[in-house]
Amino acid sequence: MIVGYTHDAGGREALALGAAITRVTGGELTVASIYPPGSPGRAVEAQANLAEAGVALEDVPSEYMAFESRGAGRGLGVLASRIKADLIVVGSAAGGQHGRIALGSTGDHLLHLSPEAVMVAPSGFAPTGELSRLTLAYVHRPQCDEAVARMSQAALRLGVPLRLITFDLRTDDPERIRDDLALAVRLAWETAGIEAEADVAEGHDVAAAMETATWLPGELLICAASEDAQPHRVFLGELAMKMLRAAPVPVTVLPRGFS
């Protein structure tokens, strides 16, 4: 995993989220500070940021890298590929609503082009210490079926419940929505032998539907890439983007073909 660290609230929240996930999974953590080319002062600043991050992560074994790039999102994507990280964690942009995700240029770039999964922390995020549940946003399409298989295995490995949530925005056949969700629950059982919880959130739009759902402290929301995503790239569609902006928990977006 790689955390994009900046000297602001979003950077600290990304760092806290990355550390929490590392403690749960036992994975390797790299903290990166991106600086523009031809800027010696910014390079020094990046090193200072990493030193600051190191103090905050005294109990978490981590690597620290200052990396030169013309854009933070691009730099994190290149660095993740170079060190074979399978997850990039970033924080919300300044000025967003507390408890919700606000995308800046870095997050927006990653959510449309990243070669690896991207996790975004809501504004004001503070870890609870325990991972309580994985929730996968589900619609009936191949990328989501692949994600059901992967997330059911992840839930089994991590020892946490898996919830499959879909949205009834009163524009589709509600019976078909529930039938599709039942098939996804069956897929989770066939893949990993776990009984996934099925949840249909109803509302006149995505934000309203998200408000009706129950969210636990320590929960993660996962979204599959859009059908428009290139192979092995993240691309967030319109519905998923609305979901991300309304989510009160950290959100992970998987690249197409995620393994």
Can you describe what each PLM-predicted range is?
Residues 25, 106, 113-115, 192, ...:
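Short, structured coil segments at secondary-structure junctions
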Residues 66-75, 201-208:
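Charged docking surfaces used in two-component/phosphorelay signaling
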Residues 89-92, 117-124, 251-255:
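Short beta-strand elements of ligand-binding domains
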Residues 90-109, 131, 205, 223-246, ...:
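Glycine-rich, Arg-bearing micro-motifs that act as flexible, cationic patches
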Residues 105-126:
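Short, structured interface segments
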Residues 185-186, 204-214:
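A short, acidic, amphipathic alpha-helical segment used as a generic capping/interface helix at domain edges
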